[in-house]
Amino acid sequence: MPLRDDGVLRGSLVLAVFTLFGLGLAYSLIATGITGALFSEQATGSLMRVDARVVGSALVAQPFTDARYFQPRPSAAKYDLTAAAGSNQARSNPDLLARIATTRAQVAARDGIAPEAVPGELLTQSGSGLDPHLSPAGAQVQIRRVAAARGWPEQRVAALVQATTEAAPQFGLLGQPRVNVLALNLALDQAGNGESGRGNGVKQAH
């Protein structure tokens, strides 16, 4: 007796087409439209601009080598967005311990502080290698260097750190107080009569 599909094949094709276009296309367009309308800044990457020029994203760390700027956490990915990753080295790894010791000495010399005063976040890399934030303590240890490089009183730089500190916990539950390094450096430039874009400081994002 021959098999009969009784419309099963047709129904399966209709379901497949509906799933493909309904969920694969229509849902994506609707979700994109809603997020673009309600969260336009976040939907486009939380980009930060100076005079309509994109200088970075609030979500992605970038390197700052100029002494006039605050430095972010170290990055195993060299701040490369396409290679985001941590070092994946265990705490017992001799290479990790040697790198931490070297970084501790470098940061202490750079910021004029005792080696034991260097916060752990300035010694270790985040899981993504692109963490855009520091704790207030991670920013505060850099105030002396930044103030000296700019010829400003330390209190002026400290006030900007305080002003750009994001309160926590978020929604009353999540996170700790933090400072977005790019936002802080842009605030420094704004307070310093538009120094952004010079040297190796805040630059246009590519």
From Swiss-Prot:
Molecular function terms from GO: ATP binding; P-type potassium transmembrane transporter activity
Topology in membrane: Single-pass membrane protein
Keywords recorded for this protein, A-Z: ATP-binding, Cell inner membrane, Cell membrane, Ion transport, Membrane, Nucleotide-binding, Potassium, Potassium transport, Transmembrane, Transmembrane helix, Transport
Keyword presence, Lipid metabolism: no
Keyword hit for Transcription regulation: no
Cystine crosslinks: none
Family to which this protein belongs: Belongs to the KdpC family.
Primary role: Part of the high-affinity ATP-driven potassium transport (or Kdp) system, which catalyzes the hydrolysis of ATP coupled with the electrogenic transport of potassium into the cytoplasm. This subunit acts as a catalytic chaperone that increases the ATP-binding affinity of the ATP-hydrolyzing subunit KdpB by the formation of a transient KdpB/KdpC/ATP ternary complex.
NCBIfam families from the UniProt entry: kdpC, PRK00315.1
UniProt protein name: Potassium-transporting ATPase KdpC subunit
Species for this entry: Xanthomonas axonopodis pv. citri (strain 306)
